[in-house]
Amino acid sequence: MRSLFPKEWVIREYTADYGIDLDVELFEECNDGVYITKGEHILFQVKTTNDIEVKDLKVYSKTNSDNCIFKVVKYPLDTALLATVEKMGSAVPVLLCLVDNVEREGYFVCLNDYIDKILISQKPDYDRQGTVTINIPIENRISSGTVAIEWYGKRAKLYSFFNLVNCQNRDLLYTSDCNLEQMVEIFLNRICRLDIWSDQRLKLFKEQIDYYIEHHSTKQADIIINDAIERGENVDEPIWEGTYCMGEVSFRHVTQIQELHRLWDQMCIISDMYETDYREAYLPTYYWSVVNE
């Protein structure tokens, strides 16, 4: 396993056999030859074999109207381990890695996600069995899967982001519009300090945040306001009443306030998308097959 990971990653072995074999801590290079920890950990359950057998797995869509084929490696896993992983929740990824001793390659699948997205829906009483066969896509190779593993490593930080923006969103609902700008500045400063922005799925939101920090208005609000100005409307006359605003305010003000709240609403939706869709990444599911085409 050590030879398959980047040399800067630190691997700690658990000597007692409680189902988890390795704690892999991810590091990154800060300057020439110097590495620092990213504060990201992934747990591994490692199995080995001298005889990898690749099989076809037919997977159907939710409506059973279409299907796809995955090339997988099957491995029987004790349900006691799966039950332990399920109790852990999904914040700390536990990856099953099957190592081919002949080809010196490892194949992985995230057990937390496999349980939630596949196993419980197909076998809700799986814990009554002695073992469950896990289907590991052969595309999930350790040697070429650094990006995927680093994505799993960000999970705890992403969950922290989800909790933070949801809490901030509730606070903003009870913040008067006269105090909103000061509160938003504090909130955005906190969000920007989170180590999550290398995730390409968040690129659009980081661009919107950077735009607000520079212009003190969201990009969408400026588009709406400029369109109104081009139509000859007076955007600064206080004749409007709007959601989140007290008394009569200008079209400019009400638009900036409403679009700012919309930005937080959109950031909160990311957590729903992550749970519903993104956690199927690298799993043998129809959704991942379609997304990965």
Model-identified regions with their sequence ranges:
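Generic alpha-helix signal with a bias toward terminal, lower-confidence helices
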Residues: 17, 23, 56-58, 118-120, ...
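Short intrinsically disordered coil segments
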Residues: 37-39, 59-65, 111-114, 125-129
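Mg2+/Mn2+-dependent nuclease catalytic core
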Residues: 51-80
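Mixed-charge intrinsically disordered linker/loop segments at interdomain junctions
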Residues: 72-159
